[in-house]
Curated annotation (Swiss-Prot):
<dbReference type="InterPro" id="IPR006568">
    <property type="entry name" value="PSP_pro-rich"/>
</dbReference>
<feature type="modified residue" description="Phosphoserine">
    <location>
        <position position="145"/>
    </location>
</feature>
<dbReference type="GO" id="GO:0005634">
    <property type="term" value="C:nucleus"/>
</dbReference>
<feature type="compositionally biased region" description="Basic residues">
    <location>
        <begin position="23"/>
        <end position="41"/>
    </location>
</feature>
<keyword id="KW-0507">mRNA processing</keyword>
<dbReference type="GO" id="GO:0071011">
    <property type="term" value="C:precatalytic spliceosome"/>
</dbReference>
<feature type="compositionally biased region" description="Basic and acidic residues">
    <location>
        <begin position="12"/>
        <end position="22"/>
    </location>
</feature>
<dbReference type="GO" id="GO:0045292">
    <property type="term" value="P:mRNA cis splicing, via spliceosome"/>
</dbReference>
<feature type="compositionally biased region" description="Acidic residues">
    <location>
        <begin position="416"/>
        <end position="439"/>
    </location>
</feature>
<protein>
    <recommendedName>
        <fullName>Pre-mRNA-splicing factor sap145</fullName>
    </recommendedName>
</protein>
<keyword id="KW-0963">Cytoplasm</keyword>
<dbReference type="GO" id="GO:0003723">
    <property type="term" value="F:RNA binding"/>
</dbReference>
<dbReference type="GO" id="GO:0005737">
    <property type="term" value="C:cytoplasm"/>
</dbReference>
<dbReference type="InterPro" id="IPR007180">
    <property type="entry name" value="DUF382"/>
</dbReference>
<dbReference type="GO" id="GO:0071004">
    <property type="term" value="C:U2-type prespliceosome"/>
</dbReference>
<feature type="coiled-coil region">
    <location>
        <begin position="1"/>
        <end position="74"/>
    </location>
</feature>
<keyword id="KW-0597">Phosphoprotein</keyword>
Length: 585
């Protein structure tokens, strides 16, 4: 048995080896697998086509069988079985009958009548709407009346969508220009707004800030300037005139030749004064030759490509510059080339107040009418030789309009009040009040000096009616000098050069408090002393005062006036300061 098993084992191994070799031989390449797949796909498509043909044949045969059975049933009068299965050539089919004739005397029919009615088809067929086609009118009788046209138009509007209706009802650009106040503000997209007339009214309103042009652009803002090379910044002409550009170039050339070590050293310790320009050149550049830069005006908004547009603000209609005359070849004293067209068609309607010589105003002196070279054409007149567009002959005298209206206020709305003007007005009012008070004090002192030398009876008569603020104008004093005497006095040589101020002992208060303080006498402190001395002098030496009245009383009077003026000025300053604090923003 052991020998038989050993003999069988090598045989099995040989069989395995042979099978492995056969598998390797039968292994297909990629191209073979691809070809087999294509072959299978072709077989599937062919089989599907054959199956479809077979199904169509079976379907035709089934319909023929159904028709035959329907005709047989109809001939026999048996319509009770509406769904019946029959078999023809092994095929099972169902016959469907359109209508069934039932016995009206059957009681079950009354019960199931509603059920049967639900399965009945409606006899009325739906009318399919024909496509809209143009109508051909062969006679006047076929013309629709107004009511029929409105009904037809209403029917057509019901068929249209909302978007198409909006487009039909939309105003055209020409109509909007005719209805607007200024046709030049109308743009082609204004007709699609909610209220085109109101939009054009807002755009035509004076001093209206326009909407930027890039509001309807679908691309990014300033994306059109990506490929444009920007110019380098150039200094203004008045700065270039100082010669600083040449000096900077020379300095840069010297720095280019310097070694790296020296450049690093100058970065740490730079040398100053390399660009030394004359002060007079700098002064003239910035104070004499400086020009105003181009700035965006009020109401202007930047848009893409604004810097590339021509600036026409400085240009005025009707003014022909010398450059334009040279470009058009207009000789001196000759008319412009568009004059003949204006004489024929009229002046431009956009400029109704523009004066054009030869159209609505006289031609210049030395010019002649006619169509010869240098002639100014034919004056625009009617059949009665009357000017059409204006005083082309210069016969009408200019009218001088008298200024009968109210004066125009030049003050801007919303302008802040100037406190200086208010202070000046207050000063004027205070001065009006000051002078009478000063005159009162001066006159009172004069009366005191005069009363010292008069008898008592005369003084009582003088002061019988007291002097008040309201009747101060009744007092008249002659030969009163209110100013101090400019001549040097006799005691000028005995005056002290300076005065020693007494020092006060104070405690230091605060972070920056003073350590020393001095007692400085003011005018208010000296005033009572002078008044006491004056009263003592008037009581003791009345006769001496009367004799020396012309020598010393004028100086004291001027001092009293100055003290009173100081008091009034201090009160006025305090009042204005309180007003400033009140109206301070």
């Amino acid at each position: 048995m052991a020998e038989i098993q050993t003999a069988q084992n090598p045989l099995k191994e040989l069989e395995k080896i042979l099978e492995r070799n056969n598998k390797q031989k039968n292994k297909k390449s990629r191209n073979q697998v691809r070809r087999e797949k294509k072959k299978l796909l072709r077989e599937k498509t062919n089989s599907g086509a054959k199956l479809a043909e077979k199904n169509s044949d079976d379907k035709d045969q089934l319909t023929e069988n159904n028709d035959n059975l329907y005709n047989d049933k109809k001939s026999n009068g048996n319509f009770y079985d509406t769904n019946k299965t029959d078999s023809v050539d092994g095929m099972v089919y169902t016959t469907i009958v359109d209508s069934v004739e039932l016995d009206p005397n059957d009681p079950l029919i009354e019960q199931f009548k509603d059920v049967f009615n639900r399965f009945k088809a409606d006899g009325q067929e739906k009318d399919f709407e024909d496509t809209d086609k143009g109508q051909i009118m062969y006679s006047d009788d076929e013309i629709l009346s107004e009511g029929e046209e409105d009904a037809l138009q209403k029917q057509q509007e019901e068929k249209l969508s909302k978007k198409k209706l909006r487009k039909l009802k939309r105003m055209t650009v020409a109509q909007l220009k005719m209805l607007s106040e200024k046709a030049d503000v109308v743009e082609w997209w204004d007709v699609s707004s909610l209220d085109p007339l109101f939009l054009t009214h807002l755009k035509a309103y004076p001093n209206t800030v326009p909407v930027p042009r890039h509001w309807n652009q679908k691309r990014d803002y300033l994306s059109g300037q990506r490929g444009i090379e920007r110019q380098l910044f150039e200094l203004p002409s008045y700065i270039r005139a100082t010669g600083i550009v040449q000096m900077r170039n020379a300095v840069h050339e010297n720095e280019a030749d310097m070694p790296l070590r020296q450049k690093m050293r100058e970065r740490v310790q730079p040398k100053m004064g390399k660009l030394d320009i004359d002060y007079q050149k700098l002064h003239d550049a910035f104070f004499r030759y400086q020009t105003k830069p181009v700035l965006t005006g009020f109401g202007e908004c930047y848009f893409e490509g604004k810097e590339l547009e021509a600036d026409v603000k400085e240009k005025r209609p009707g003014d022909i510059s010398e450059e334009l005359r040279e470009a058009l070849g207009i000789a001196p004293g000759a008319p412009p080339p568009w004059l003949f067209a204006m004489q024929r068609y009229g002046p431009p309607p956009s400029y109704p107040d523009l004066k054009i010589p030869g159209v609505n105003c006289p031609i210049p002196t030395g010019a002649q009418w006619g169509f010869h070279p240098g002639g100014w054409g034919k004056p625009p007149v009617d059949q009665f030789n009357r000017p059409l567009y204006g005083d082309v002959f210069g016969n009408v005298k200019p009218r001088i309009h008298a200024g009968t209206g109210s004066p125009v206020s030049t003050q801007h709305w919303g302008e802040l009040e100037e406190f200086e003007e208010e202070e000046s007005s207050e000063e004027e009012e205070s001065e009006d009040v000051e002078y009478p008070t000063e005159e009162i004090t001066e006159r009172e002192t004069i009366e005191e000096y005069q009363s010292a030398s008069e008898p008592r009876s005369q003084r009582e008569d003088l002061h019988a009616e007291p002097l008040t603020y309201f009747n101060q104008s009744n007092v008249e004093v002659d030969n009163v000098e209110l100013r101090k005497n400019t001549q040097p006095s006799s005691d000028a040589a005995n005056r002290d050069l300076y005065q020693v101020l007494p020092e006060k002992s104070t405690n230091i208060s605060g972070f920056m408090g003073p350590q020393h303080q001095y007692d400085i006498p003011t005018a208010e402190d000296t005033l009572p002393q002078k008044r006491n001395a004056h009263s003592m002098l008037s009581s003791t030496n009345k006769g001496d005062v009367a004799l020396n009245q012309s020598s010393n009383w004028q100086d004291e009077l001027s001092e009293l006036v100055s003290e009173q003026a100081m008091k009034v000025g201090a009160a006025k300053r305090q009042k204005t300061q309180s007003k400033r604090d009140k109206f301070r923003l």
